[in-house]
């Protein structure tokens, strides 16, 4: 997925502190609004609990206070990826081959921006998703948002 320049910079800044605490930085989202939000997704082999989120929040807050890369007021949220896990990298898609995903595209493909199907393959910066029995290929740079579809 194409991250904004700010999201790329933030990812570079906070990856090491998050990993030093023993967590994987799954991804970040910066949502601009009246009150902007910096959302950080973390994970670990043992799962994530509230204390884990608090630890990462304190560590990341300290880094952001020193570096001060965000020029507007914002709320910091740290959470697990959840059942509808967001997908940010080619590695995420590869890890979840065979799983169902919902994609929202930046630019429409075949007059559609929203797609849902099963992740079939990852090849560099392209993914193949089987939608209604037909393989569709998408550039990661054209994916605005992607989430796993939870099944109960």
Curated annotation (Swiss-Prot):
Alphabetized InterPro entries for the sequence: Ribosome_maturation_RimP, RimP_C, RimP_C_sf, RimP_N, RimP_N_sf
Localisation: Cytoplasm
Please tell me whether the keyword Translocase is annotated for this protein.
no
User: Which Gene Ontology cellular component terms are annotated?
Assistant: cytosol
The principal localisation class reads: cytoplasm
UniProt xrefs under Pfam families? DUF150_C, RimP_N
Some GO term, biological process aspect, for this entry: which one?
ribosomal small subunit assembly
Alphabetized UniProt keyword annotations: Cytoplasm, Ribosome biogenesis
Gene3D superfamilies given in the database record: Ribosome maturation factor RimP, C-terminal domain, RimP-like superfamily, N-terminal
Enumerate the NCBIfam families for this protein. PRK00092.1-1
Q: Which family does it belong to?
A: Belongs to the RimP family.
Q: What job does this protein perform?
A: Required for maturation of 30S ribosomal subunits.
**What is the name listed in the Swiss-Prot or TrEMBL entry for this protein?**
Ribosome maturation factor RimP
Origin species: Citrobacter koseri (strain ATCC BAA-895 / CDC 4225-83 / SGSC4696)
